[in-house]
């Protein structure tokens, strides 16, 4: 009789499992994305923030790990350890891109080429793609601002820049270098500038560096020097 009872219990459990409702697949859509800055305290890391709206159609909390959900940003894949409450919910997903693990991805992200971003998972052996898009945040060149005889470089980017190069004026070249804070400015320091060159037009030949990631050259011109009255 014991084997019969065991078989009966197993059959009952099997029927209950078959009747139990399966979890419905959640939905997700990307609302916005931004580069949030550059960490340098523990080595350079570019911070990417993604604002995502999730929808859990089930009447119970749903762990995304159930679907093996992961966020892919170029060559980087980040497993999502989130539990969604029933209904809709917004989350900001942060991704750290370091030169050691994601140099190519970070460089592509800061170029016009951009990088592919996708939220993926799987259920019952089937691949799931919640969303897939391409993000690009090209490096913006600094802007020159004049205040009297002083000139300032404004950095419109959300990360700091190391700037070095030359001011070419009236056939002469003067060394320029500075560190620009994120979305900040710095006074243009010209090494070797001499009186008598205050009036004229020239150009700035600069190399911009995102510390730890890449360097980019550009020329800003015409560059006018106008003495104060």
Residue ranges and their predicted role:
Residues 44-51, 111, 145-150, 199-202:
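Short, solvent-exposed loop/turn segments enriched in Ser/Thr/Gly
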Residues 73-105, 171-197:
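Intrinsically disordered, low-complexity Pro/Gly/Ser/Thr-rich segments with frequent PxxP/GP/PP motifs
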Residues 53-54, 123, 153, 167, ...:
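Hydrophobic beta-strand positions in extracellular immunoglobulin-like domains
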Residues 99-139, 195-229:
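Terminal connector regions
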Residues 60-68, 160-166:
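Short, hydrophobic/aromatic beta-strand segments
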Residues 54-60, 151-159:
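Asparagine-centered strand-capping/turn motif at beta-strand->loop junctions
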Residues 1-17:
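Sec-dependent bacterial lipoprotein signal peptides
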Residues 18-36:
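Bacterial Sec signal peptide processing site at the extreme N-terminus
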